Regions:
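Bacterial N-terminal signal peptides
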Residues: 10-19
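Boundary at the C-terminal end of the N-terminal hydrophobic targeting segment
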Residues: 23-29, 47-49
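Conserved serine DD-peptidase/penicillin-binding transpeptidase domain
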Residues: 28-33, 54-93, 140-436, 525, ...
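Bacterial N-terminal signal peptides that target proteins for export
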Residues: 1-11
Length: 560
């Protein structure tokens, strides 16, 4: 299990760690003179000699020896000249990151700056944004906060028949029917809801089962998300009632020949109201999966476009479902039928305050009953916020992250619109003493390319979180090098080093970031290193950038 130092107070080991030892460096300068040949945790003893024989390349070694020309660590304006800072200078000259933006800030809690380069430059954080969202939510709402989903009805019950509608009153729970192990299995959840009907004496519903997502107002997704992302499961938006994280699974396979239509069929959840336009074609062997899905929340229609290579095996794609509340009502409707309870009026959701039964019609029905006017017969609760935050950070779950941000707005300012949520987030920053005047936040997950954070802001937030009463729970939500979802990080380092590096990745096209905490081998809280490393506009694969960032984190770990 990952060792979480006693410096982090109540934090407990929660992540399974992969074992590993020190591995020799792969000195590849002769065949790749533009690359950096790196080994872990050492000094710059041989860099100058290597530069003489291989111009443009630098070898960082951990031989244990010391160059007679090595400059001892000195303090200049709070910054220590050290292996990490020197290496950061070398990295900036390397061809891999040439022309890209590269920024870093790493400080000890006690005040020393270990490494710094362009720390105030605003950059795209990608999923490093989730560190901010989860931390703010845990600090403001508390680690044991839970969402509630309730059942209520309009009308009257007579002789076992509900003369009215049954409402599933959403409370923002993002885990309903989720596959995550922390979530309540959907059939168990439905059995609890059915038990509430039985206890209330309802054996038949004369009206409809209505999925009510009004707890979250405002658009279901952020307008600054890329258009091609909107239909994929990374951009599942939602209101106050969801189902299966608002994911639609679709089985896809190549056609019989190149140019033939791709075969696509919905798998789960069942959404018989949906119509699909299949305008994707079978591509040549080796061209891969280039499918895109374009749905809309206004009608029950989605279009699948792009290509799918003929040599690919069938697979299940995950797309976004724009009708989460309606889907939840429909799934519960079907469950009740298996128990002999029928809803005569079918299913519906609530849009613009009105009951909607036909998803293709722009003419909605009567106004939905006010929640306060319903007779509530029971409710269920979500897992704790700290459990949801753990999955948010480990899985880098965008849907959970967006829900957490909008929950801050709903709980603190009675509105879940993004504008209200930003105000709430700034309130949290103020309570933590974090200056957010130099950043721009446009969502909770990092999917938006309109988010602009700097390493100095991320570091200041992470440092401030160490003073939060909820920090012991927060640190447990952050992954560990070598642990779950980070098995390949710092792979050449010892288990001791990997166990001390708590990190969150951030990745999208051209973006690779890591931020987090590094525990000291020995020492006090003041020796904890807080770091943020950000690269933007890189024209290479993440697999080419990761070894450089891994080495920076390894050098940082060697500093304490």
């Amino acid at each position: 299990m990952g060792r979480i130092n006693s410096l982090f107070a109540s934090a407990a080991a929660v992540l399974a760690m992969a074992s590993g030892g020190l591995a020799p460096a792969q000195a590849n300068q002769r065949t790749n003179p533009g690359n950096l040949a790196l080994t872990s945790g050492g000094n710059l003893a041989s860099a100058q000699a290597n530069q003489r024989t291989h111009p443009g390349s630098y070898a960082l070694t951990s031989s244990g020896g010391h160059s007679t020309e090595q400059t001892p660590a000195v303090r200049e304006g709070g910054r220590r000249q050290n292996r990490t800072q020197e290496y950061v200078g070398l990295v900036s000259q390397n061809d891999i990151l040439k022309g890209s933006q590269f920024s870093i800030l790493a400080v000890k809690v006690g005040g020393d700056t270990i490494a710094s380069r362009n720390p105030d430059t605003r950059m795209l954080p990608a999923s490093n944004m989730k560190l901010i969202t989860t931390g703010a939510a845990i600090h403001a709402l508390g680690p044991d906060f839970r969402y509630s989903t309730r059942l209520g009805y309009s009308g009257q019950i007579k002789d076992g028949v509900l003369d009215g509608d049954l409402y599933i009153i959403g409370g923002g729970d993002p885990t309903i029917a989720s596959k995550d192990s922390m979530a309540v299995p959907r059939f168990f959840l439905f059995s609890q809801w059915a038990g509430m009907l039985e206890k209330a004496g309802i054996r038949e519903i004369g009206g409809r089962i209505i999925g009510d997502g009004r707890y979250f107002d405002g658009p279901i997704e952020k307008d600054s998300w890329a258009y091609h992302d909107i239909g994929c499961s990374d951009a599942c938006g939602g209101d106050g009632l969801c189902f299966y994280e608002n994911i639609q699974e679709v089985k896809v396979s190549a056609g019989s020949s190149v140019g033939a239509p791709v075969c696509a069929a919905p798998v789960f959840p069942t959404t018989p109201w949906m119509r699909y336009g299949i305008n994707a074609r079978t591509g040549k062997a080796g061209t891969g999966d280039n499918l895109y899905y374009f749905p809309t929340e206004y009608v029950a229609y989605g279009e699948i476009v792009g290509s799918y290579a003929i040599d690919l095996k069938p697979r299940t794609e995950t797309f976004s479902n724009k009708f989460g509340a309606y889907t939840c009502a429909y799934q519960f409707f079907n469950y009740l039928k298996t128990k002999g309870i029928e809803a005569k009026g079918g299913v519906a959701d609530v849009r613009m305050g009105r009951i909607r039964t036909d998803l293709d019609s722009q003419e909605y029905g009567s106004y939905a009953a006010k929640v306060d006017d319903l007779t509530v017969i029971g409710g269920t609760q979500s897992p704790t916020l700290k459990e949801i935050a753990l999955m948010t950070n480990l899985k880098s779950d965008n849907f959970y992250a967006e829900t957490l941000l909008r929950t801050l707005g709903r709980r603190m300012h009675h509105s879940a619109t993004y504008d209200s949520s930003y105000v709430a987030l700034n309130d949290v920053f103020k309570s933590l003493g974090v200056d957010a005047s130099g950043v721009q936040i446009r969502d909770g997950s990092g999917l938006s390319r309109h988010n602009y954070l700097s390493p100095s802001f991320i570091v200041s937030f992470l440092k401030a979180m160490m003073g939060s009463p909820a920090f012991g729970d927060y640190i447990q939500t952050i992954g560990v090098a070598g642990g779950a979802h980070y098995e390949s990080r710092l792979a050449s380092e010892s288990t001791d080093v990997r166990n001390r590096v708590h990190l969150k990745s951030g990745s999208m096209n051209g973006v690779r970031c890591y931020s987090g905490y590094i525990e000291p081998r020995d020492g006090t809280k003041e020796d904890v290193i807080v770091f943020s490393i950000m690269t933007n506009n890189a024209l290479v694969r993440a697999s080419q950038v990761d070894p450089i960032l891994d080495r920076i984190m390894a050098f940082l770990a060697s500093e304490n």
